[in-house]
Swiss-Prot record:
SUPFAM superfamilies assigned to the protein according to its UniProt record, in alphabetical order: Ribosomal L27 protein-like
Source taxonomy: Bacteria, Pseudomonadati, Pseudomonadota, Betaproteobacteria, Rhodocyclales
Protein name: Large ribosomal subunit protein bL27
PROSITE patterns reported in the protein's UniProt record: RIBOSOMAL_L27
GO CC annotation terms, alphabetical: cytosolic large ribosomal subunit
The encoding gene: rpmA
Superkingdom of this protein's organism: Bacteria
Length: 87
């Protein structure tokens, strides 16, 4: 009789999808209202003038303009602001 051993089973082979976090638009770049600037977990970057913060802490542009990153306050928070384009 021909016999074939049972194939082994593996307990590996699973991995979660990458979350694609990080800075999406950099300082000096021109953005349109609604463009995503930073995707993050928690407020690594804080919203400044003309920047909104979503419920998942995503920072996005509220007006068209140029992005500016700066460090402010005693806590040295990284703040993202948008200098509006001249209308």
């Amino acid at each position: 009789m021909a016999h074939k051993k049972a194939g082994g089973s593996s307990r590996n082979g699973r991995d979660s999808q990458a979350q694609r976090l990080g800075v999406k638009r950099y300082g000096g770049q021109f953005v349109l209202a609604g463009n995503i600037i930073v995707r993050q977990r928690g407020t690594e970057f804080h919203p400044g003038d003309n920047v909104g913060c979503g419920k998942d802490h995503t920072l996005f542009a509220l007006k068209d303009g140029v992005i500016q990153f700066s460090i402010k306050g005693l806590k040295k928070r990284r703040v993202v602001t948008i200098v509006p384009a001249a209308e």
